[in-house]
Amino acid sequence: MTYNLKKYIRTDLEDFDGYSACKAPELVKTSKQIIKLDANENLYGAAPTVRQAMSEFNQYHIYPDATQSEIRRLLSEYTGVAVEQIVCGAGSDQLIDLLLRLFINPGDEVINCPPTFAMYKFYTELNRGKIVNVPRDASYNINIAAINNAITPQTKLIFIAAPNNPTGTAISKEEIRQILDLGVPTVVDEAYYEFTGQTMVSDMSKYPNLMILRTFSKWAGLAGLRVGYGLFPPIIADYLSRIKDPYSVNIAADAAVRQTMLQREYMLETVKKIVNERQRLYTELSKFGWLKPYPSVANFILCKLLKGKAKEVQHELESKGILVRCFDAPMMENCLRFSVGKPEDTDGLLKALGEMGE
């Protein structure tokens, strides 16, 4: 019997593009020690107390706190935002998805500023919304006038990454305010906040259309545990809490975040080291005549290849045990992105790139 399951699947997903995630280190075929510079993780790892807590934890058979009450209390102290305005999720990705589920009816529009974080488009289309792209300029800065011109009665959300990923481009608070003044609900993604020190939190009382996302994946060394949080107007936080699955932050992640917040000064010291190393990496990459690095305020640097093919360089680096991200989308043709790691990671990358340029 032939059974056609496909006829029951949503027709709008037939040509849906999945997300191309980074390769897990254990899948890399190399005898070399892996230097993982492809996913903007903190290579210093989690705080020592997190690792200790994980080894001693004995409640994996118990469901976690569905409201993440202790995490939210600690985050309230950290951010200065009221507990009832904080919502936690399985990475900020889940919160992006939930926001789109909350705001989007089929055909509603979401303004996106590519090249930028791919999950804005991913979840918009998954939730039957329409992406309206307002491209950045050649230096990857946003075009506020073009955003204004793109707004229609169907516009429900604007996504702004601050700073932008994958380009590392900064955006000023004044520019964000100009976007907020347009009156559309706006999500400011501060995934890399700890590396910049710039936040829009103090503007939340003035702008009821401002929503902020953050994550523990980049600065806190918890990428594998998937924890993010958002700072929202009370009405949005209430709706998100209602539609969010209750156990999305698992019990191991809950325990790890608690320890991270208690040891945040330790983790912020690793952030300072990464910021210092970022400057060294940028300076050294600038010396290669075949690479054009772009200024970055995050924990990675985007480079355009002026000679050669980015995909071939990525494969050559992988054969040496060095994992980097390759991009070839519009406005990012023939580009590589290097996460900033420890000094020894930078040394290994620079040595490998130097050998290729010889």
From Swiss-Prot:
Assigned EC number: 2.6.1.9
CDD domains, per the entry: AAT_like
Signal peptide (UniProt feature, chain positions): none
InterPro entries attached to this UniProt entry: Aminotransferase_I/II_large (IPR004839), HisP_aminotrans (IPR005861), PyrdxlP-dep_Trfase (IPR015424), PyrdxlP-dep_Trfase_major (IPR015421), PyrdxlP-dep_Trfase_small (IPR015422)
Gene3D superfamilies per UniProt: Aspartate Aminotransferase, domain 1, Type I PLP-dependent aspartate aminotransferase-like (Major domain)
Keyword Glycoprotein: no
Quaternary structure annotation from Swiss-Prot or TrEMBL: Homodimer.
HAMAP family: HisC_aminotrans_2
Identification of the protein by name: Histidinol-phosphate aminotransferase
